[in-house]
């Protein structure tokens, strides 16, 4: 019986890894595809904020409601439906003739992504440790690394951003089929090992209203808003910065943009090995200091290769931050509020993904692309300050 349970857990972990690879792929596509998309639809540079906002609307809605959805449908059913929804949205991007229809499909893709993200994060935070959380998010990094590469190949060979989205859409549909075939495994309950077994985060039934009244919950959500906003901003705007003002060719810029996600992935793999030994606070604080230095180097740009060095440094530095913050949710807000807070944090990531890159796009349009690294430095420095505030609050609690 124990062997069967162990095999089931291993299978679910592998599927979770694959799901996060697929989840990361679309996030890596947009930054490289955007110059071609805006020319195709004759729209301004900062119109990307509209698409991001639409995606976030869907993402925030499904992530906030992920708890009730999983309780009613089961984890496997939610994941299967969500992957199919994401695949449909991405495929739709390639078929619509006008911009506003692509924006509407952004909501569809966001609905799918939000439920996958929140559901898997809650499941892993409840059942596994910090090391596995880092490895899970490393698989997301693999997906985001593959995204720019797939899109660069599509643009270089057939000059078609639509091909890149169709390839990634196919991955989403295949994954949806995998979840359908393993529904029984996801929905199976573990047998209780005794009345003194520690409660999992999902065992607490704290009302959402009570959770929302906790100031520390909102402070925790702010961390995710700032972090994911900065992470997605660099992924979204690196390519445009390199080809716009740094004189880098599109093919090389695509590879450099991919280097951000590559070092990002390597960083999470390394963190997965050392996470337990180093501890959450050191991972987060060290990563944020490295990110501030990397963003400053990107802005300084003393020689051409420094852009590549800066992007790679930021990717490696911020790699462990998101999973470490996710694993530390219970420590920051208390176990009673952790499950609800995770859903709120995932909603905050969606909001940050739309607001911060969109604002940076507005600033870049009104001034210069060179304002991008300045904005990143400010956001990372603010995030470091907010995190230190939460650490001090924990110490006083």
Specify the residue positions occupied by each region the protein language model found:
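Extracytoplasmic gate region of multi-pass secondary transporters
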Residues: 30-31, 214-258, 262-265
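A late C-terminal transmembrane helix in Major Facilitator Superfamily
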Residues: 334-369, 376
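Helix-to-loop junctions at the C-terminal end of transmembrane segments
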Residues: 62-75, 267-279, 364-365
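Helix-breaking motifs and short loop linkers at transmembrane-helix boundaries and internal kinks
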Residues: 42, 74, 95-100, 247, ...
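Conserved MFS/SLC helix-loop-helix module at the cytosolic interface between two early adjacent transmembrane helices
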Residues: 61-100
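Interfacial helix-cap and linker-helix signal at transmembrane-aqueous boundaries
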Residues: 37-38, 69-70, 150-159, 242-243, ...
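Helix-loop-helix hairpin linking two adjacent transmembrane segments in secondary transporters
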Residues: 136-188
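Cytoplasmic helix-loop-helix junction between adjacent transmembrane helices
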Residues: 105-140
